[in-house]
């Protein structure tokens, strides 16, 4: 299913999330199962299925990584069950530095400063990747789509690192 069509957007990485939320509410009102309570069982089942599609579409389009994955899937590149790893040497080196920094936080003289520095580093790198991804997804070229898939892999890794950093920060605050 093309969620961009469902929500009446042109396939693009940058979408107006306020408009997305508004269209989500409109679609929810139109297909909500309560609206079909007195209809046939088939109509009620169809309403439940349609509601699930609307919910999944909304969750997909509001999350930048899932939105990018969806755009790539529409172009025949499925990253959902993939085991391909990032081959970018510079990124792998950066990844190792971040991992070491995560391990060193607890022994740091000022753990919160180390955490803040890592958050800043993640944000700067994520911004750089997002700019590349936006340009690559807007291109119609197959090569750019493959490069965009690499950016998505990197962003997924960074999301895991961010979650790990949040867990470390929460543990230090306890």
From Swiss-Prot:
<dbReference type="GO" id="GO:0006457">
    <property type="term" value="P:protein folding"/>
</dbReference>
<dbReference type="GO" id="GO:0044571">
    <property type="term" value="P:[2Fe-2S] cluster assembly"/>
</dbReference>
<feature type="domain" description="J">
    <location>
        <begin position="2"/>
        <end position="74"/>
    </location>
</feature>
<comment type="subunit">
    <text>Interacts with HscA and stimulates its ATPase activity.</text>
</comment>
<dbReference type="InterPro" id="IPR036869">
    <property type="entry name" value="J_dom_sf"/>
</dbReference>
<dbReference type="GO" id="GO:0051259">
    <property type="term" value="P:protein complex oligomerization"/>
</dbReference>
<dbReference type="GO" id="GO:0001671">
    <property type="term" value="F:ATPase activator activity"/>
</dbReference>
<protein>
    <recommendedName>
        <fullName>Co-chaperone protein HscB homolog</fullName>
    </recommendedName>
</protein>
<dbReference type="GO" id="GO:0051087">
    <property type="term" value="F:protein-folding chaperone binding"/>
</dbReference>
<comment type="similarity">
    <text>Belongs to the HscB family.</text>
</comment>
<dbReference type="Pfam" id="PF07743">
    <property type="entry name" value="HSCB_C"/>
</dbReference>
<dbReference type="InterPro" id="IPR001623">
    <property type="entry name" value="DnaJ_domain"/>
</dbReference>
<dbReference type="GO" id="GO:1990230">
    <property type="term" value="C:iron-sulfur cluster transfer complex"/>
</dbReference>
<dbReference type="InterPro" id="IPR004640">
    <property type="entry name" value="HscB"/>
</dbReference>
<comment type="function">
    <text>Co-chaperone involved in the maturation of iron-sulfur cluster-containing proteins. Seems to help targeting proteins to be folded toward HscA.</text>
</comment>
<dbReference type="InterPro" id="IPR036386">
    <property type="entry name" value="HscB_C_sf"/>
</dbReference>
<keyword id="KW-0143">Chaperone</keyword>
<dbReference type="InterPro" id="IPR009073">
    <property type="entry name" value="HscB_oligo_C"/>
</dbReference>
């Amino acid at each position: 299913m093309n969620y961009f069509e469902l929500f009446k957007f042109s396939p693009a990485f940058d979408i107006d999330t306020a408009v997305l939320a508004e269209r989500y509410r409109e679609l929810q009102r139109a297909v909500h199962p309560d609206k079909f309570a007195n209809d046939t069982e088939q109509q009620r089942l169809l309403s439940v299925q349609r509601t699930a599609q609307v919910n999944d579409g909304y969750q997909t389009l509001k999350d930048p990584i899932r939105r990018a994955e969806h755009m790539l899937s529409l172009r025949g590149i499925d990253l959902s069950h993939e085991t391909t790893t990032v081959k970018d040497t510079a990124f792998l080196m950066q990844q190792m530095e971040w991992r070491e920094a995560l391990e060193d936080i607890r022994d740091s003289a000022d753990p919160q400063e180390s955490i803040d520095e890592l958050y800043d580093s993640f944000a700067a790198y994520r911004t750089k990747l997002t700019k590349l991804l936006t340009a690559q997804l807007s291109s119609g070229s197959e090569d750019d789509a493959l490069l965009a898939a690499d950016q998505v892999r990197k962003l997924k890794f960074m999301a895991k690192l961010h979650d790990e950093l949040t867990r470390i920060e929460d543990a230090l605050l306890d």
